[in-house]
């Protein structure tokens, strides 16, 4: 499969859309830098075009659909994972593995010196994400990108061969 994950793109869109509100459950200023205006507008149009699916009475706008139907799962899971990550860091975690990382921006928003992040996803996702991060001038110095098939069964060896230290406390996220 050589296509980008539509689920990852939609999750990124949800986080970008959520940033426009005054009160945010999840603050993610980096997400906006990774999604193009064209992608944002195209996804918005697709959601509006399918509004009748969510609200058959035809009485819905983009914000209503997003806030009542689409955003709660993505925003809630992401917020829970980030709160858990912050707790793990307080408890001494020095490594952070993001399985099926997609366009997750948490490794770039953690403020913890000496924490190494490992983003693991399919090669085309890793390539696209690293290009988006580079274009947005996001510092990736604490992140190791690993292209891998998560169904391979050889993940432990792949991670270790990319600098993972099995003796350090590690937090693992699997939102993808």
Q: Where are the predicted features?
A:
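Rossmann-like AdoMet
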Residues: 1-97, 103-146, 166
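Conserved SAM/SAH-binding loop
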Residues: 149-152
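Short amphipathic alpha-helix with an adjacent loop that forms part of the alpha/beta core around
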Residues: 155-166
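A short SAM/SAH-binding and catalytic strip from SAM-dependent methyltransferases
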Residues: 164, 168-176
């Amino acid at each position: 499969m050589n296509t980008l994950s539509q689920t990852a793109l939609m999750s990124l869109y949800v986080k970008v859309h959520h940033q426009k509100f005054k009160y945010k459950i999840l603050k993610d200023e980096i997400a906006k830098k990774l999604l193009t205006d064209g992608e944002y507008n195209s996804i918005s149009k697709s959601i509006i075009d399918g509004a009748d699916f969510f609200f058959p009475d035809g009485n819905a706008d983009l914000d209503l659909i997003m806030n009542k139907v689409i955003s709660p799962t993505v925003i809630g899971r992401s917020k829970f994972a980030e709160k858990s990550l912050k707790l793990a860091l307080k408890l001494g975690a020095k490594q952070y593995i993001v399985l099926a990382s997609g366009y997750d921006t948490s490794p770039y928003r953690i403020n913890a010196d000496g924490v190494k992040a490992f983003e693991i996803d399919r090669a085309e996702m890793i390539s696209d994400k690293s290009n988006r991060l580079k274009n947005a001038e996001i510092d990736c110095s604490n992140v190791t990108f690993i292209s891998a098939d998560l169904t391979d069964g050889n993940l432990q060896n792949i991670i270790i061969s990319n600098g993972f230290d099995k003796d350090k406390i590690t937090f693992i996220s699997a939102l993808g």
